[in-house]
């Protein structure tokens, strides 16, 4: 365990090491999955005139797995895409059409018709056998200008190429930067590529938020194995982030696999090949999820909430979520105030069963990570302990404020009641967040 002030290694993967990282240098690479192309267009849905239509097409039919918002109020494209995947049993898809600048949510029969139009038109233009899946993002309750949308889809279909960066830009709303990851692995001697794009900066909460994400891979994997890989990928990525506790009507994560990498089809979820692909998908999803938190509306700090020693993983997740969604904790981090009492209160009211107050220890730390004591060289974690076995420890307010002035900080809570750990990523709550959301429609 930590002493009052210690240096420890902090687990860190190759994702994010500074606030908003090197977003300005994100670019297309040569590791795009075989057989996929993207087309984009600015049809005028956004007042800024920025790209707002994205069409993704595979030359070969794909297996698809997807997860959707758990909000009871679901947007028309969510309902349509979900029904198409169920109807076709996750197979035979070649295209996805996305618009930003309008959520097409709470738009009634007209909105449902517009989602169908987007689906049929885009699939027809790329000669796909099945309807396209559809995603939309933007303001809720406004009908899409379908003349603009149909023009945009047509233009995008005429300009299909290997340009994932433009695709990432086309789905942005309040995002400050595009979010794109590309990864290459080897399976059975074959080069397998994965590309992911996503958008999201507000209305972010576990079990999906105002977030759209598409992963495309040329791996050959069965639909059942693909569904399993996606589930495990999002459980510890998109379902482990929080910005403001609001859950959107449009959240969707979908993965397409066309098999053009040439590997032997992956059927078993116990195989070495499956585990390699799942790990790569999870790493892509984690990086994209953390990009969302770092790009959160008004955010100035990336916060890792690390719960250790939980009796069950469920308890760990419940407590991490309670801390990550606490407005008082988030504003304290913005103010660089080591108010550990707010964290302890969030633990207490979380509803988790395995909470024994006299067992709890707590640290605040500079740095980013999820497993204290495991990390890369030259990556020290500076931690200060504020609670030991349920009792406060002596603290130096000046040193604490300096520690919390870092852009990457960790809140570490050890329940000392088991061996399960859980990490959630969140951000601070700032004046700029209030400004951004009070003026969103204007």
Swiss-Prot record:
Record family assignment: Belongs to the ArgJ family.
PANTHER family: ARGININE BIOSYNTHESIS BIFUNCTIONAL PROTEIN ARGJ, ARGININE BIOSYNTHESIS BIFUNCTIONAL PROTEIN ARGJ, MITOCHONDRIAL
Residue span of the annotated presequence: 1-23
Record GO cellular component, one term: mitochondrial matrix
Complex formation: Heterodimer of an alpha and a beta chain.
Organism the protein comes from: Dictyostelium discoideum (Social amoeba)
Biological processes per GO annotation: L-arginine biosynthetic process; ornithine biosynthetic process
Pathway recorded for this protein: Amino-acid biosynthesis; L-arginine biosynthesis; L-ornithine and N-acetyl-L-glutamate from L-glutamate and N(2)-acetyl-L-ornithine (cyclic): step 1/1; Amino-acid biosynthesis; L-arginine biosynthesis; N(2)-acetyl-L-ornithine from L-glutamate: step 1/4
Protein name as catalogued: Arginine biosynthesis bifunctional protein ArgJ, mitochondrial
Source domain of life: Eukaryota
GO molecular function, one term: L-glutamate N-acetyltransferase activity
């Amino acid at each position: 365990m930590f002493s009052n002030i210690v240096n420890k290694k902090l687990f860190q993967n190759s994702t994010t090491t500074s606030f908003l990282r090197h977003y300005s240098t994100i670019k297309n690479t040569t590791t795009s999955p075989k057989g996929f192309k993207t087309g984009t267009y600015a049809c005028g849905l956004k007042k800024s005139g920025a790209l707002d239509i994205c069409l993704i097409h595979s030359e070969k039919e794909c297996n698809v797995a997807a997860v959707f918002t758990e909000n009871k109020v679901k947007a028309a494209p969510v309902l349509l895409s979900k029904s198409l995947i169920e109807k076709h049993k996750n197979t035979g898809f070649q295209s996805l059409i996305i618009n930003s600048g309008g959520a097409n949510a709470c738009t009634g029969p007209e909105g449902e018709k517009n989602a169908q139009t987007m689906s049929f038109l885009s699939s027809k233009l790329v000669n796909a056998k099945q309807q396209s899946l559809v995603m939309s993002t933007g303001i809720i309750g406004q009908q899409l200008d379908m003349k603009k949308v149909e023009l945009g889809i047509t233009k995008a279909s005429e300009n299909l190429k290997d340009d994932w960066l433009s695709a990432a830009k086309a789905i942005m709303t309040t995002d400050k930067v595009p979010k794109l990851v590309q990864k290459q692995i080897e399976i059975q001697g074959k080069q397998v590529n994965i590309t992911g794009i996503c958008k999201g900066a507000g209305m972010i909460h576990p079990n999906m938020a105002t977030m759209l994400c598409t992963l495309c891979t040329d791996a050959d994997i069965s639909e059942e194995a693909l569904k399993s890989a996606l589930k495990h990928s999002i459980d510890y990525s998109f379902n482990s982030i929080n910005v403001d506790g609001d859950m959107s009507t449009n959240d969707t994560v979908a993965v397409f696999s066309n098999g053009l990498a040439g590997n032997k089809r992956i059927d078993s979820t116990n195989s070495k090949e499956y585990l390699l692909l799942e790990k790569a998908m999870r790493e892509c999803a984690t990086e994209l999820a953390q990009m969302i938190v770092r790009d959160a509306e008004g955010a100035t700090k990336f916060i890792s909430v690390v719960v250790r020693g939980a009796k069950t993983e469920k308890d760990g997740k419940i407590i991490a979520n309670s801390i990550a969604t606490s407005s008082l904790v988030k504003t304290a981090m913005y103010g660089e105030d080591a108010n550990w009492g707010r964290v302890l209160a969030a633990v207490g009211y979380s509803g988790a069963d395995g909470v024994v107050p006299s067992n709890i220890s707590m640290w605040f730390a500079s740095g980013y990570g999820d497993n204290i004591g495991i990390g890369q060289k030259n990556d020290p974690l500076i931690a200060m302990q504020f609670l030991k076995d349920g009792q406060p420890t002596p603290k130096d307010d000046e040193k604490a404020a300096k520690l919390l002035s870092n852009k990457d900080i960790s809140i570490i809570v050890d329940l000392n009641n088991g061996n399960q750990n859980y990490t959630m990523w969140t951000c601070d709550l700032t004046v700029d967040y209030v400004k951004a959301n009070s003026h969103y429609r204007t």
